[in-house]
Curated annotation (Swiss-Prot):
Involved in pre-mRNA splicing. Keywords: Coiled coil, Cytoplasm, mRNA processing, mRNA splicing, Nucleus, Spliceosome. It comes from the Eukaryota. GO terms for biological process: mRNA splicing, via spliceosome. InterPro entries: Bud13, CWC26_splicing_factor. The gene is CWC26. Its main location: cytoplasm. The lineage of its organism: Eukaryota, Fungi, Dikarya, Basidiomycota, Agaricomycotina. The keyword Kinase does not apply. Associated with the spliceosome. It is found in: Cytoplasm; Nucleus. This is Pre-mRNA-splicing factor CWC26. The keyword Transmembrane does not apply.
Length: 331
């Protein structure tokens, strides 16, 4: 404890107080005498003693006055200098943990005020001196610090608590932006909600256009697409067309007209595309001219009504013919 007082007096104090501390630390023979605890000596000792009777012991005032004067003179004996003031000894509150630690602790070297510097967290230089990371000060655990340093650290901590710095690559939030919440308190992203609404409206418009196309019929849609394709080809083709134009002649031959007299004996165009299979072979006629399916095995499993119906028609037609022939036989 005396070494600490001597170090502080040598480095940070001046005047008679510092001189007294340095003188006491340099001379081991000088020790400060502690004052004896004052007690009420009026009841201790004196010319009259009553120990036998168990009463109080009295002491003369002259004897007490002289003894207290001598004690004061003895207490003032080691005083050196003028207006001397010393540190009051106090019990240290630091706990030694050297016995519990297996690693040796480094000894702290005394430093001057010029050598005291803030602790700076060193980071590796990745991209050179131009891209070095910003200096970050760590929290100090102890040591002497000036009022300016304490004020600066306090202001910096308060600023970090009020507005924490965003992570790298993230945009700083706008403090003036309005925050919307739902009934449960959850934050609503207005931009995301608007984007979802726009996508939903586009999907509804597309479905509405598809429903309108469904009502127009497949044939009309196919004709429209064919006309659009033809117009595109005509826009790319030459303006002049002669009678030897192969494409024009082919289109005119493939076109069907309801009042064409040669449509009955001309070769009809073959329709391309998938076709349903048909039954190959003879089959009994019916009133509606419906052909059997291609999986029919040729066995008639009906009740015979169609067959009787055609026989009755043929019989009536034959009788009418015979009646007409008989009626004109005499002519």
């Amino acid at each position: 404890m005396s070494d600490l007082k001597a170090y502080l007096a040598a480095k940070y104090m001046s005047g008679p107080k510092a001189d007294a501390i340095l003188a006491r630390s340099s001379d081991p023979t000088l020790k400060k005498k502690r004052k004896k605890q004052q007690t009420n000596e009026d009841y201790i000792g004196g010319s009259v003693k009553a120990e036998a009777s168990g009463g109080l012991m009295l002491r003369d005032e002259d004897e007490v006055w002289g003894r207290s004067k001598n004690e004061d003179e003895e207490d003032d004996a080691p005083v050196i200098g003028k207006d001397l003031a010393t540190f009051k000894g106090s019990k240290s509150s630091w706990a030694t943990v050297a016995n519990k630690s297996a690693l040796p602790l480094p000894q702290a070297e005394p430093t001057s005020p010029q050598d005291i510097k803030p602790d700076i967290k060193e980071e590796p230089d990745i991209d050179g001196p131009a891209a070095s990371a910003p200096v970050q000060m760590t929290k100090r655990r102890g040591g002497l610090r000036t009022a300016a340093q304490l004020k600066e650290d306090t202001e910096r901590e308060l600023a970090e608590q009020r507005s924490p710095s965003p992570a790298e690559g993230e945009e700083r939030p706008d403090p003036t932006e309005t925050v919307h919440r739902d009934a449960t308190g959850k934050i609503i992203d207005v931009k995301k909600r608007q984007e979802e609404e726009r996508i939903r409206e586009e999907e509804e418009r597309r479905k509405e256009a598809e429903r309108k196309e469904w009502t127009k019929g497949m044939v009309q849609r196919r004709d429209r697409e064919e006309r659009r394709r033809l117009e595109k080809k005509m826009a790319e083709a030459d303006v002049g067309r002669s009678k030897d134009d192969v494409r024009m002649n082919k289109e005119m031959k493939e076109e069907e007209r309801w009042n064409d007299p040669a449509a009955a004996f001309l070769t009809k165009k073959k329709k391309k595309g998938p076709r349903r299979p048909k039954y190959e072979g003879p089959w009994a006629p019916n009133r509606f001219g419906i052909a059997p399916g291609f999986r029919w095995d040729g066995v008639d499993r009906s009740n015979g009504f169609e067959k009787k119906y055609f026989q009755a028609q043929n019989t009536r037609a034959r009788r009418e013919y015979e009646h007409n022939q008989w009626s004109v036989e005499d002519m």
